[in-house]
A protein has these predicted regions:
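Long, hydrophobic, amphipathic alpha-helical segments used as structural scaffolds
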Residues: 43, 71-79, 107, 159, ...
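Terminal leader/tail segments of proteins
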Residues: 25, 62, 66, 74-75, ...
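HKD (HxKxxxxD) catalytic microenvironment of the phospholipase D
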Residues: 104-148
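Domain-start "cap" segments at the beginnings of catalytic or binding domains
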Residues: 1-35
Length: 173
């Protein structure tokens, strides 16, 4: 009998190590696709978010649909440097203008500026994380709150040491 491999059922834990940018982009899309309430993103700059395809129409549509589903749904982004966000991520900025009460974009300060592990977290149960900003390897875990918890805590530590940097009303200043 010929054995076929199919994707695991949606509730089964998924863990993968990625070596390439293309694999990482696919994994990020998977994490974003799992979001039902909140997305947390930490990265160094708008340019790196753009390189990870956060400016693409499909990604923005996914985030828009999440935010439209409920006013309590959130997108929180922490960046080391927010310069260039308008030119690098115009669709994200348009989304921020439309959903200013649901999206926050912060800039890291203090010890948080030393963080070097970009991550995307959805709903406390799914995450993509780059092991170090300068290295190609990254990991994705889906459907596992226990494995995601340390990265939620890590994000919250970074968030606590950040300040509001971009709002729908201070663009273009």
């Amino acid at each position: 009998m010929h054995e076929t491999h199919s994707p695991p059922p949606p509730s089964e834990k998924v863990y993968r190590l990625m070596e390439t940018r293309r694999e990482a982009h696919t994994a990020i899309d998977e994490v974003l696709g799992q979001a039902r309430r909140e997305i947390r993103i930490f990265d160094a700059s708008p340019k790196l978010l753009k390189d990870r395809e956060f400016g693409h129409a499909a990604c923005i549509d996914l985030i828009r649909n999440l935010l439209l589903a409920n006013r309590d749904h959130r997108l929180r982004i922490a960046l080391h440097d927010t310069r260039g966000i308008e030119s690098d991520l115009p669709r994200l900025i348009a989304l921020l203008t439309q959903f200013s009460g649901q999206i926050q974009i912060h800039r890291t300060i203090g010890q948080a500026t030393e963080a070097r592990d970009p991550m995307v977290i959805a709903d406390n149960a799914h995450f993509w994380r780059k092991l170090h900003v300068d290295h190609p390897r990254s990991v994705v875990t889906l459907h596992c709150a226990a494995d995601t918890r340390p990265f939620v805590e890590r994000f919250e530590e970074i968030w606590e040491q950040s300040e509001l940097a971009v709002t729908g009303s201070n663009l273009g200043l």
